[in-house]
Amino acid sequence: MSKSEDNITKQVKEMYLKYPYPSPSREISETNELVNLLKIFEIENKEKIEKLKILDAGSGSGHRIINVAKYLKNCSFTGIDISENSLLIANELKNKEKIENIQFLQKNILDNNTEIGKFDLILCMGVLHHLSDPNKGLQILSKMLNKNGMIFLYLYGKLGGHKRMLNKELISIILGKDKTDYETGIKIVRDIGLNKFDYGWNLKCESIEEENSLIVDSLLHANETLYDSITVNDLFKKSGLFGYAIFGISVGTNGLLFDVGSKNNEKLPIPQTNISKKLNSKSVLEKYEGKSIREKYRILELLYEPNGYTIIGFTKEGYEKLSNERIKRNFIKID
């Protein structure tokens, strides 16, 4: 048993034993959000991701990270997850796809995992917010970065996640005391028509099994913490990192690149936040331009109401080698 396997961790582990996510029947070609994100990062940073040692913290059933390992053939990958069942699926998928540059290990993010080494890039996408102690989780992961390292996080958004949380509460009340009765919970979700999903879960399900995994992950999860720009800043303040920047946000069923600037990169054919269109007033925009980065973050999230944030945390050396101008505009140094 893991040293940090508290009651919440045990519940999450049991949940994924019954309902691994993504579902084992899901094709990796249909879970390409993470590889697309890294491709965008490469385009904007004008540099290929090559020969890096990469950790995927919370691999689940491995679909997304195997897709990435397939793309970044010159990088070496380690995927960790607390669920033995999920890792069995991940290894089967790895063998099926003939991927040789990744290993999977059963580890708890909340444990001191120094024996697996340090990494140039850490991915923790949609996982930290499920930990019993996200602050501790980020602190531990930050210590596993090399001196010029970066960490990508995906965190649930409080503003855009409000309706989903109301739906979760509704289902929980109807379900009653036994919150681990996922079968009944799934039936309730279908019976009242709540089996529709936001960006991140918004996948076309080919089977009941796939949809069951989505329902459990989005509406019956044992534990989650939602964030806004204020609590994101609190999270990073305690991380030991040099600073961070919001890379992108999810809004409803769409993903947007995040930019505090008032002029977008029109050469990049990808949807982006656009403060000029949202405010649509020269005098108000002038006031906006005079605000701090954190105030701009808050204004943008109040206008867009994200249900999720993709965030990059940097070591000092990792930030100094960055050439991505949009991320530099968005960067917040931790005091």
Regions found by a protein language model. Name each.
Residues 113-121:
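A short acidic, Gly/Pro-enriched loop at the edge of an enzyme's catalytic core
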Residues 135-147:
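A short glycine-rich, Lys/Arg-flanked "PGG" loop and its adjoining helix->strand segment in the class I
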Residues 61-73:
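Conserved SAM-binding loop of SAM-dependent methyltransferases across substrates and taxa
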Residues 152-195:
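Conserved class I S-adenosyl-L-methionine
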